């Protein structure tokens, strides 16, 4: 018997809504990355994007343990000479909470073309409202 290999046009995708309120950032992100990759499905195939869509709401209320708010940073470069920048988690949570969750999940996905394709299925919103009601997403309780 041959092993099953999913084909991109055969993959059925679901939509899930995850409430980030009170959830720990790293634990939440690893669960979301698993769903985006499709590793929770029996038809998982490493070279095909078999994952589902994930909508994260209440990103502004995500929890960070310890002193991570002040001691952890995301580093990026503007592309100009001397353009290395760092932003603390506290500042990021205050200004753009969506990017905090987005970057945490991004770091847990493959750094390839397929990983970038998987990341397009992640939708993050700071508040409780989202604009994907037409897709009839299922509420997903993580942890």
UniProtKB/Swiss-Prot annotation:
Q: Which UniProt keywords apply?
A: Ribonucleoprotein, Ribosomal protein
Q: List the GO cellular component terms.
A: cytosolic large ribosomal subunit
Q: Which Pfam families match?
A: Ribosomal_L13
Q: Which InterPro entries match?
A: Ribosomal_uL13, Ribosomal_uL13_bac-type, Ribosomal_uL13_CS, Ribosomal_uL13_sf
Q: Which PROSITE patterns match?
A: RIBOSOMAL_L13
Q: Which Gene3D superfamilies match?
A: Ribosomal protein L13
User: Which GO BP terms apply?
Assistant: negative regulation of translation; translation
Superkingdom to which the source organism belongs: Bacteria
The terms under GO molecular function for this entry are: mRNA binding; structural constituent of ribosome
Name the job this protein performs.
This protein is one of the early assembly proteins of the 50S ribosomal subunit, although it is not seen to bind rRNA by itself. It is important during the early stages of 50S assembly.
What family, per the record?
Answer: Belongs to the universal ribosomal protein uL13 family.
Q: How does it assemble?
A: Part of the 50S ribosomal subunit.
Identify this protein by name: Large ribosomal subunit protein uL13
> To which species is this protein native?
Alkaliphilus oremlandii (strain OhILAs) (Clostridium oremlandii (strain OhILAs))
Report which gene this protein is encoded by: rplM
